[in-house]
Amino acid sequence: MRMMMALIVLMTVAPALIAAPAKAQQPLSHIVEPGDTWSALSMRFGVEESHLKVLNPHFNASRQPVIGTTISLPGEASERSGRLIRDGNPGIIAVALENNVPLWSLARDNGLESPYRPTFFRPLIVPAEGTIRDLPPGITTLEVSSSPALPGIALGIRGASQAKVPDISGHLDGLPLAFATENNRFVGVVGTGAFFAGGEPELVIKSGDAPAWVQPWQFAEREWIYQELTLTGEAAQIDQEARDEERARLRELWSQITPEPLWQDQFITPVATYLEVSAGYGARRSYNGGPYLTYHEGVDYSAYGGTPVTAPAAGQVILAEPLYVRGGTVIIDHGLGIFTGYYHLSAIHAIAGQTVQPGDVLGEVGTTGLSTGNHLHWDLLINGIWVDAAVWQEQQMDCWILEGLGRPCGTETPPG
């Protein structure tokens, strides 16, 4: 009887003693930043590259993770800190000596059986505080201004190097970046234009004599509006040839890049009082029933004729005269390949060669040139490419650039 009771108790308890099958851990998500290559992510989270690529399939297996996208990590991934070094010629022994790390400890932490075998350019992790990232040689930090990016806006990269910034250059899908450096800091800026295809173009950075560093950058889609404009009178007589001739002359001015930023404050809107924003940047335009072959290159502020137009930031006036298409025109060079233009003015008060400060009067609102009514057309260019001036202000790109160089950025609006 006792044996029977024991069996019953055992049968009752036994199921509770059997461990339930472990639930699979849910994948983690990670937003890709510059330097998050497959090898860097593998070392940072302790996951094989092959496993990461299985979790994040792409038709091009050799393509690095795209900046601004979200990728999956195994649920058991555990992050560690350190600094990634591309081994190259010195070898692991030289890396250990340079970083004051025990040789065998460095080999063990990098999964090497022996420190005396060649590493064949394999990246190494040395103990350090900070995030493990695979950056251009000599560069210790790198960030982008927008992630994901948008076509038609100002884009930038900024970072720092171990010592003085090496000779640095770069491009985004063939569009060159304009760089400024200060001590161990650097900033690069580029514009894409409203017709930029977007997708996942490659950001390429060249640091010194080292091979180019490449990582794709995600662009989100942007919605544009379509406008049909009817031109009459003198404005209707302005043909495409006249536009091209005027633009060719201005491109010569826009190509002369001042290497340093000339501004110290946030850009202010160049008209203190206006009726409305009558046209935004990027709007696709048809003139007198023609095809939509162009886009609006600036921001239009509808205002009463004679309203003062002022400088948004410090810079040098490089043109101040009436033009055939743009009418009364003032163009300012703000440095670092950044220019602003003020068109259709009824009166011009600035002089070419003049240095201006925020709030200085440039001219007055009018309707000269290719215009359908009193308004100010304000545009902003980077390396000769038009970008959205309104988004520049929203992003506070002016301060983002200055802060990247370690400079202060004022935010006070000058008195009117």
What residue spans do the PLM features occupy?
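Zn2+-dependent peptidoglycan hydrolase active-site motif and core
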Residues: 296-297, 311-349, 374-379
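Conserved, short, structured surface segments that act as functional micro-motifs
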Residues: 101, 112, 118-121, 277, ...
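Acidic, glycine-rich catalytic/binding loops that coordinate metals and/or anionic ligands
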Residues: 138, 221-255, 262-264, 302, ...
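Surface-exposed, glycine-biased beta-strand/turn segments
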Residues: 216-326
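Loop/turn positions that initiate beta-strands
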Residues: 35, 68, 89, 120-124, ...
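Extracellular LysM carbohydrate-binding repeats and other cell-envelope/extracellular binding modules
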Residues: 23-31, 47-85, 102-140, 181-186, ...
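Short, well-structured beta-strand-loop connectors
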Residues: 308-318, 350-365
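Cationic-aromatic interfacial patches
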Residues: 24, 127-216, 221
